[in-house]
A protein has these predicted regions:
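C-terminal and inter-domain tail/linker signature
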Residues: 1-141
Length: 141
């Protein structure tokens, strides 16, 4: 196995552990997939960058409470020089306040692009891109 393919394998395993922990609702396990002291989430729908265990953990806790029984399907995965880029399909049940919308009990499905940024084998940021209007339409329609 070449150095490049070995590094890609390690990164892909980190991404898979990260996604599995999100599906399990295990915020501590999600945070452990990041390099120590380098926890960061980015995305316009998050209101800007979130940096550190506390900020990211609070966002994940609220998000996983609002959208329970989360299922994430990796549709595509691409390796870049310093990132793993994923196209995902997410499905969950709206069980608590989400962006000002009280729990509806509705099942929602949407697509997301998640870019997992690495320094070598160390994950230091996840940047997420999704259409919040698609989610809101399913919750209010």
């Amino acid at each position: 196995m070449t150095d490049t393919s070995h590094l890609r394998s390690i990164r892909e395993q980190v991404v898979q552990r990260h996604i599995a922990a999100e599906e399990d609702g295990d915020v501590a396990a999600v945070l452990r997939t990041f390099a120590p002291g380098r926890v960061s989430y980015s995305g316009d729908t998050l209101g800007g960058d979130l940096i550190g265990d506390h900020a990211v953990g609070a966002m994940l806790t609220a998000g996983l409470a609002a959208m329970s029984d989360l299922k994430i399907e990796i549709l595509r995965l691409h390796h870049a020089e310093d990132a793993v880029i994923t196209e995902l399909r997410l499905a969950s049940t709206h069980t608590a306040d989400f962006d000002g919308i009280p729990a509806t009990g509705r099942r929602v499905t949407y697509h997301m692009c998640a870019v997992f940024r690495f320094d070598g084998a160390d994950l230091w940021q996840e940047a997420v891109y999704y259409d919040i209007a698609t989610i809101k339409a399913q919750l209010t329609g």
